[in-house]
């Protein structure tokens, strides 16, 4: 009886893993480009999923980049905004003061997974990295839920914010410390 239970659990786990599907961007390289750096992301669509017209992925809190430096495969369009395009049912962290990058598929021919979607790039002034979130929306391929949208979220490497992005945070912290300075000086004089 125990053997049947374990075999059933293994079979259920295998079915669950087989139906798991995502669009996954991954930082593949950072290369020097003059005084800047090109951040290259490779993206893939996994099994049981397809990319259709208007499916997309967003890299949150990327920060400043060189305008017009973006490159993407044919059939994809680039956009950036402070509040990223976000698929339903996921809650990525999105700082409203840091730019997000979104690539949207505008092609008419679905890309059936598993498949490499290509390299998506943008230039920025740093090669220092940190972790942020990405989210993606694609379409279920096959089965009783064929054609329904699938959302996923995960971690991805992005540039460390420039000092200009940190300036408001440093200003607030400095102002807070300055308000404490008179109190500190009074205590020092009385002590």
Locate predicted features.
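Sec/Tat signal peptide C-region and signal peptidase I cleavage site
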Residues: 17-21
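Short, charged juxtamembrane terminal tails flanking transmembrane helices
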Residues: 187-191
């Amino acid at each position: 009886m125990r053997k049947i239970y374990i075999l059933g659990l293994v079979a259920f786990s295998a079915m669950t893993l087989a139906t798991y599907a995502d669009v996954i961007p991954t930082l593949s390289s950072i290369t020097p480009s003059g005084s800047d750096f090109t951040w290259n992301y490779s993206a893939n669509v996994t099994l049981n999923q397809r990319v259709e017209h208007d499916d997309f992925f967003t890299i949150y809190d990327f920060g400043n980049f060189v305008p017009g430096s973006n490159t993407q495969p044919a059939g994809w369009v680039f956009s950036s905004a402070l509040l990223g395009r976000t698929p339903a049912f996921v809650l990525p962290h999105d700082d409203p003061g840091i730019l997000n990058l979104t690539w949207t598929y505008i092609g008419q021919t679905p890309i059936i997974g598993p498949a490499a979607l290509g390299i998506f790039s943008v230039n920025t002034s740093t090669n220092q990295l940190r972790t942020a979130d990405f989210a993606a929306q694609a379409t279920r391929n096959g089965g009783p839920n064929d054609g329904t949208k699938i959302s996923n979220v995960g971690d991805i490497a992005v540039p460390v914010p420039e000092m200009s992005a940190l300036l408001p945070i440093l200003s607030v912290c400095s102002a807070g410390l300055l308000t404490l300075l008179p109190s500190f000086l009074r205590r020092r004089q009385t002590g």
